[in-house]
Structures are given as C-alpha cells and as structure tokens.
C-alpha cells in the first residue's frame, strides 16, 4: 500500500506540473497576442553589422600593418639597432608571411565562390 501511495503522489505531482505548464502557455499566448495588438513594448536598437567588404578591408589593412612592422624591424636590425634582436625580426617576418598567406587563401576562396555563382544555371 505504501508503494501505491507513492505512485499516487507522483501522479498528482505530474498533474500539477502539467496544469502549471498549461497556465504558463496560456499566459505566454496572451502576452504574444497582446503584443501584436498593442505593438512592440520596447524599441530594439539595431546593431550595425559590418559588411563583407568592410571586414575584408580591415583584414587587408591588418596584413599591411604586420608587413610594415616586419619591414621596419628588419631595417632596424640591418642598421645595427641594439634594441632589435634577430628573434624579434624572425618572429615578425613569420607573422607577416602567415598573415599574407591567409589573406591569399581568403582571396582564392572568394574568387572560387564568385566563379561558382557565375557558372550556376539560371
């Protein structure tokens, strides 16, 4: 009989949860209908999403800056600047090389996507 009481308790809890869920759904539906009738309650500010060309332009500028910095370090090392050591020059040169290679790969992918779109049948 003890097990039966436990089952009844569980069933009553399930019923209570179901009625609570139904009430919450009704409240949400009422609020959504009220929102459609009254209009939006708050005005959401639109976030400016950068365009692809802006992002690509920033990437190109970033690569240019990295290459300029590597060139300046290389020149300073060649001139005998004691504050510039060979490790900094080599690391800057590798960063420059990697960033330029990444930019080249992005360009290749964009060109390939453009060609795929142009070859699509209408």
Swiss-Prot record:
It comes from Marinobacter nauticus (strain ATCC 700491 / DSM 11845 / VT8) (Marinobacter aquaeolei). This is Flagellar hook-basal body complex protein FliE. One of its GO terms (molecular function) is cytoskeletal motor activity. It holds the Pfam family FliE. Its main location: other. HAMAP family: FliE. It is found in: Bacterial flagellum basal body. Keywords: Bacterial flagellum. GO terms for cellular component: bacterial-type flagellum basal body. Belongs to the FliE family. InterPro entries: FliE. GO terms for biological process: bacterial-type flagellum-dependent cell motility. It comes from the Bacteria.
């Amino acid at each position: 009989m003890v097990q039966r009481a436990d089952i009844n308790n569980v069933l009553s809890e399930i019923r209570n949860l179901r009625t609570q869920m139904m009430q919450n759904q009704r409240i949400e539906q009422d609020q959504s209908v009220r929102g459609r009738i009254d209009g939006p309650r708050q005005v959401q500010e639109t976030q400016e999403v950068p365009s692809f060309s802006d992002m690509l332009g920033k990437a190109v500028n970033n690569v240019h800056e990295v290459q300029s910095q590597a060139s300046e370090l290389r020149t300073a090392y060649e001139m005998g600047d004691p504050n510039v050591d060979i490790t900094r020059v080599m690391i800057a040169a590798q960063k420059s090389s990697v960033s330029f290679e990444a930019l080249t790969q992005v360009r290749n992918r964009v060109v390939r996507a453009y060609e795929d779109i142009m070859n699509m049948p209408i």
